[in-house]
């Protein structure tokens, strides 16, 4: 009710960066569908939308087990979608498992060709030094839980986390493209359960929103 009230008051849509549920269940999916259908909400999928329980291998095969239910949450592609709001192209890309797929970079390039400023909506924040340092301190395993972490760090992770969060070629390609594309003006992300703002590539603000925070962000 509070979120809906803010949306009515401001006239702005809600940008949700994932984990709208904690685990997959019939009841949780029903609640999420009602919320999204009743709210002006643009949604980037998170890892918990696919989570049947903790500790399982996270890959496209695992996603596929619950993807049919996740796809019912929104009337667009959960892997990649865009929406123009106030002259800004908001692009939601699924990186819920710490990687990007090859076609997502190609699709982002086509969005950029529209010529509008782009704000990326991701679940997992992109690697940035200060955020990585904070995450390493908070993690009992000294793990970043970020997308695009250099191999110099992930190679020292416990084996399960290294395989989970290693930066593959497709992910490196996407991040290289984001770093060099000046029409990409900001990144909105979630996943970490706390608020954090930093700068990527010396020019792109990355705004991480925690699990209990509702922000109003002004883009100029």
What do the predicted segments below correspond to?
Residues 2-13, 98-197:
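His/acidic metal-ligating clusters that form di-metal
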Residues 18-19, 46-47, 123, 190-191:
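Active-site glycine-centered loops adjacent to acidic/histidine catalytic or metal-binding residues
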Residues 18-23, 70, 95-98, 162-167:
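Short, flexible loop segments at the rims of nucleotide/cofactor-binding pockets, characterized by
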Residues 21-22, 89, 126, 194:
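Short active-site segment of divalent metal-dependent hydrolases/proteases
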Residues 26-119, 142-146, 180, 197-218:
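Extended active-site neighborhood of metal-dependent phosphoesterases/phosphodiesterases
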